[in-house]
From Swiss-Prot:
Protein name (Swiss-Prot/TrEMBL): SH3 domain-binding glutamic acid-rich-like protein 2
GO molecular function, one term: SH3 domain binding
Expression by tissue: Highly expressed in brain, placenta, liver and kidney. Expressed in retina.
SH3-binding (motif): residue ranges: 61-67
Keyword entries, A-Z: Nucleus, SH3-binding
One GO term describing the cellular component: nucleoplasm
Similarity comment: Belongs to the SH3BGR family.
Pfam families per the UniProt record, alphabetical: SH3BGR
Coiled coil: none
Keyword ATP-binding attributed: no
């Protein structure tokens, strides 16, 4: 399965852009394979994202905002959940990936 990060490339909200960049930079820095899915370029992908965010994670009004993170078809969470997992050092578990062990250089 590949990690899919649903983003909006043409979002007018600075906060959304910063959150999207934070997720992407973290994944790149940790060499985690992922795919960016731009919901502003595909109505089909936008509707898929809206449909597959669990009801308890949907806002009371409107639609879920990017970034939304999936591992294949399995919902991982939104930015707030990602940030919490980053702070608690549980991102691999959050993403449904096996943790990587840091390797130490031999003296």
């Amino acid at each position: 399965m590949v990690i899919r990060v649903f983003i909006a490339s043409s979002s007018g909200f600075v906060a959304i852009k910063k959150k999207q960049q934070d997720v992407v930079r973290f994944l790149e820095a940790n060499k985690i394979e992922f795919e960016e899915v731009d919901i502003t370029m595909s109505e089909e992908q936008r509707q898929w994202m809206y449909k597959n965010v669990p009801p308890e994670k949907k806002p009371t009004q409107g639609n879920p905002l990017p970034p939304q993170i999936f591992n294949g078809d399995r919902y991982c969470g939104d930015y707030d959940s990602f940030f919490e997992s980053k702070e608690s050092n549980t991102v691999f578990s959050f993403l449904g990936l096996k943790p990587r062990l840091a390797s130490k250089a031999e003296p």
